Amino acid sequence: MSYNTHHNIGSGSRTARTLEFGRTHVVRPKGKHQATIVWLHGLGDNGPSSSQLLESLPLPNIKWICPTAPTRPVTLLGGFPCTAWFDVGELSEDGSNDWEALDASAAHIANLLSTEPADVKLGIGGFSMGAAMALYSATCYALGRYGNGNPYPVNLKAIVGLSGWLPGARSLKSKVQSSHEAGRRAASLPILLCHGISDDVVLYKYGEKSAHSLTSAGFRYLTFKSYDGIGHYTVPAEMDEICHWLTPKLGLEGYRS
């Protein structure tokens, strides 16, 4: 099942500019619906292609929502337009951050989750830039607000990031530690990060650095997995890790090994 969304994002964007998100593909649960996870693609990719990987996972109790990012000029590509959750000059936490687009995309993702049933647990995952977006959403959840100060509306139960990085890492610790509630939410949110040691697109050291930034800011429920000889792509071992990790974190009944 897929559909397009073209609407104005107001809750996460300073200027409430109109962003045209592309096709969203939904992978329906094959068993009892216990969890919904929004899965976010990498730079230049799309939601339907992500869904092909997720459909084969032995997780029958999860509904996967796979949106497509807006097409925008990307500084890293010399201004060439492609699908991107936000503009980026380099694929690391050392680069400058496109806060307006980060907030707008985070609001779009939260909106996709906001209509799920109350008894369904909610999560966000992604690959590369999608992982960066998932981690930014995790920080918004912990802080209780987007970067622009508007309230973050969704109660997240799990975050998965493959081959990604953490936007806003430099200021995260001080923000989380300034609020008891933010610290409590950060400490209780399970996060799984996986990164290939041979990744030459988002370097492994940036994955390590992001994990350290998160844990030092109070995200203590974090697991970091490294993979020898693996570059900037997913492998079956990572997907197996996701299945084994998500099952107890979300209390899933129907995991098939």
Where are these regions (language model features)?
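Short hydrophobic segments within beta-strands
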Residues: W39-L40, G125, L162, C194
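Intrinsically disordered, low-complexity domain-flanking/linker segments in eukaryotic proteins
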Residues: H6, G144-Y152
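The feature captures the conserved acid-bearing segment of alpha/beta-hydrolase catalytic domains
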Residues: R28-K30, G149-Y255
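Gly/Ala-rich beta-loop-alpha elbow adjacent to hydrolase catalytic centers
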Residues: G126-G130, A134
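Serine-hydrolase catalytic machinery in alpha/beta-hydrolase-like enzymes
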Residues: Y3-G123
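Active-site signature of alpha/beta-hydrolase-fold catalytic machinery across serine-
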Residues: Q52, Y136-C140
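Active-site catalytic pocket residues across diverse enzymes, especially alpha/beta-hydrolases
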Residues: L57, Y141-R145, G218
